Amino acid sequence: MELDMTKGSPAKLITKFIIPIIIGNIFQQLYSMVDTIIVGRFVGVDALAAVGATGSVSFLILGFTQGLTTGFTVLTAQRFGAGDREGMRKSIGSAAILSVIVTIVMTAVSMGGMDSLLRVMNTPEDIFDMTKEYIMIICAGIACNVLYNLLSSILRAIGNSVVPLVLLVIASVTNIVLDYVLIVYGHMGVGGAAYATIISQGLSGVLCLIYIIKSVPTLHIRPEHCRLESQCVKNQLTVGIPMALQFSITAIGTILVQAALNLLGSTVVASYSVSCKVEQLVTQPFAAMGVTMATYCAQNRGINDLDRIRKGVKAANIMSGVYAVLVYGLVYIALPYIVPLFISEQVEMVCGYARTYITICGMFFIPLGMIFIFRNALQGCGFGFMPMMGGVVELLSRGIVAFAAAHLMSYVGVCFANASAWLTAGIFLWIAYHFLMKKMVREKKVHEERMLAGAMQ
């Protein structure tokens, strides 16, 4: 199921590649929502707040590992696009070793420092123990998350977005079933929700490995491929570390928002958690577009077809903009019917807070789409620093607004923290993309002139 994105209509290729990713991401968010619904309705609002309070911490830890594994496989996509199969296999072997190291380090660090981090975040005392229980189990299962993210990223690097979809559907169904069994019948509370998550992730990772072994000989590696060659590692870390830091910088911003939010009480935290679940669901096409553009641009960067990269980015922005407008109106209308799915108490109050959040953030969906497109396009082209700086812009904007909101004890201010981050980072990355594209064009022209001069000698 390989897909060569260096030939054919960019818009058609993007559409073909993105649809399975969107479906997979939506399934992933749906099982996350079901997770929240079951916790909220069968354990209570405090438990819902406890799980919601871990969202930014999970993003910090798992986002860092995801950034690394995704960054490691950008080189795989570039070598696939260039037709260098042996170099591609070496990049896979190197990525596997680096991912094992990352897993060990991140598991130890996250579990060791979690108590202090939750205290710094002003986690309410009435939900502290449940919050810690949930996130510690998630951290213990980092290996499951890394296994799936690495293998699915490798498959996407060669243009296969269908199999990761199938595996996500399987994982989603497994997670929902385990949620219900462990929470409703096993009476395991938030711990049951956490165990359901890591078990389903581990299953999808194992199934992904089995599929590659049985059906994708192109990706089969031998012992000699599993070496940390200096140039290969340098190339992978050049993209992987900035991607990981970009995730972490963004996550730190969300932690600042969560800290401001925690000052407003567990009911507001629960309301914000519901709002974020809805937002994360409807913004999955933006994230899917980002993954698509990383693969599309990496493959075309492998053959240095810059004009084709431009056309793809333009098509992606048009699709993203149209979707942003449509989904904002849809969510605004449907929200009063969605919120009661999550909770059975304090419905009117939670719905009011949720509507405020969606109303404010929904107006900034277009720059959010720009962030995913330009950031991933640049990363696919091998640039790590500017996308990371986009994360810094997000952090500064989100942090300043969150600080002001905490000082004023303002929920509306907290909602504007995310919106301001999307707007400022979207503009920054738009400028960075055009600047670096011009740089690549100049470098290509110089290279072609040198090649021509050499041929004439």
Residue ranges and their predicted role:
Residues 69, 137-156, 164-172, 193-208, ...:
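Short runs within selected transmembrane alpha-helices of multi-pass transporters and secretion channels
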Residues 25-29, 63, 103, 107, ...:
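Residue-level hotspots within the lipid-embedded alpha helices of multi-pass solute transporters
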Residues 1-18, 76-141, 185-241, 297-364, ...:
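Short alpha-helical transmembrane segments in multi-pass integral membrane proteins
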Residues 21, 25, 37, 74, ...:
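Transmembrane alpha-helix boundary and packing residues in multipass membrane permease domains
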Residues 16-35, 137, 171, 200-204, ...:
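Transmembrane helical elements of multi-pass membrane transporters/channels
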Residues 5-43, 56-71, 75, 100-107, ...:
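N-terminal transmembrane alpha-helices
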Residues 48-108, 145-164, 271-335, 368-390:
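Small-residue-rich hydrophobic transmembrane alpha-helices
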Residues 30-48, 118-125, 181-188, 248-281, ...:
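Helix-terminus/linker motif at the lipid-water interface of multi-pass membrane proteins
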